[in-house]
């Protein structure tokens, strides 16, 4: 072995180690189903929906759906907490620094706890609701018909397919119908939240857990 070959043999592992370490550090961890009530939670496994239970792990990029009356809570390390409302179907994000979860239908409440420089978003066929830092927000979608985003605390930004954006601060919401322009500004959410029997009933930031639409005494 000549000197050049020997040097290459030393340098190659030295170069690869930091790269491998960086790749391993960036790999997101699996999430956990920390709560499940009112029905079933299923994941798509080899083209078949299979029921999963509280305490089981869920992986990045997995497709999940809840039963007609089920509410499931999922904790994702370095991202936050997701609460799937009844009759919801989602695909969990794949990138730890830009964790975009796709929602085909239903309602998804997101509580983020993101490291600096990271972003999380809920993507629907009509719009994308994105957040950086810490926020509590809920997104409701009716497939390709409409989408609604409501913010409990912090700020989120909703972007339509044509690139138009609207900020949604704490205590406000925005609703977008398919084929319609994004509203110029968000509206106060109080009139909607005070109505029982709405899709917002399961939101844990404003409503009593399992309270069937009952608002928390300190929700304002």
Tell me what each language-model feature is:
Residues 1, 25-26:
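Absolute protein N-terminus
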Residues 1-11:
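Bacterial N-terminal signal peptides that target proteins for export
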Residues 9-19:
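Bacterial N-terminal signal peptides
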Residues 19-25:
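Sec/Tat signal peptide C-region and signal peptidase I cleavage site
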Residues 26-220:
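Flexible, surface-exposed loop/linker segments and immediately adjacent secondary-structure boundaries
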């Amino acid at each position: 072995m000549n000197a050049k070959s020997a040097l290459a043999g030393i340098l190659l592992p030295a170069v690869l180690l930091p790269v491998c370490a960086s790749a391993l550090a960036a790999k997101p961890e699996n999430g956990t189903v920390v709560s499940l009530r009112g029905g079933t939670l299923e994941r798509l496994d080899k083209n078949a929906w299979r029921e999963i239970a509280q305490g089981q792990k869920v992986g990045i990029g997995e497709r999940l759906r809840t039963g007609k009356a089920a509410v499931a809570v999922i904790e994702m390390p370095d991202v936050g907490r997701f609460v799937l409302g009844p009759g919801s179907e989602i695909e969990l994000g794949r990138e730890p620094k830009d964790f975009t979860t796709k929602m085909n239908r239903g309602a998804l409440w997101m509580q983020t706890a993101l490291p600096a420089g990271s972003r999380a978003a809920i993507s629907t066929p009509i719009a994308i609701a994105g957040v950086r830092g810490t926020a509590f927000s809920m997104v409701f979608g009716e497939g390709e018909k409409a989408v609604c985003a409501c913010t409990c605390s912090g700020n989120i930004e909703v972007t339509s397919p044509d690139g138009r954006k609207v900020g949604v601060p704490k205590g406000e919401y925005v609703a977008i119908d398919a084929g319609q322009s994004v509203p110029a500004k968000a509206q106060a959410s109080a009139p909607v939240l005070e109505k029982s029997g709405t899709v917002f009933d399961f939101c844990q930031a404003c409503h009593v857990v399992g309270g069937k639409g009952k608002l928390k005494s300190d929700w304002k």
